[in-house]
Amino acid sequence: MKTNRSAEDYLECILLLSQQSEFVHRVEVARKIGVSQPAVQKAVKALTESGFIECDGLHLFLTAAGRDYAERVYARHCIIRDFLQMHGVNALDADSDACEMEHCISEATYQMMKKYVKG
């Protein structure tokens, strides 16, 4: 299923929040991503319709497909971040740059970075 950058950011955010707490709330997602609650509501609707998340009215949950996709996006983020840090980029910039790069680098470039990072 095709997603866009925004959807990937939401899935990654929900994954990270769910690792910190059993329950993820829309307001936490809005705060972490830096968007309005109506923007989160719109994204939740689209991600629910795509089968990536479920919502019980208060809490957001990743479906199996959503968790799998979010984990792949986050793994990509981590490899890029680690690659940048290995090349002297400070941790804060490496993390910020990885957020941008994870959406636009080619699979070949990602695989090269992964091979380099994993040794």
Q: What role is predicted for each listed range?
A:
Residues 77-79, 95:
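A generic alpha-helix surface/boundary motif
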Residues 10, 29, 40-48:
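Basic amphipathic alpha-helical segments that dock to polyanions
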Residues 2-35:
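N-terminal helix-turn-helix DNA-binding core of bacterial DNA-binding proteins
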Residues 48-58:
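A short, conserved structural fragment
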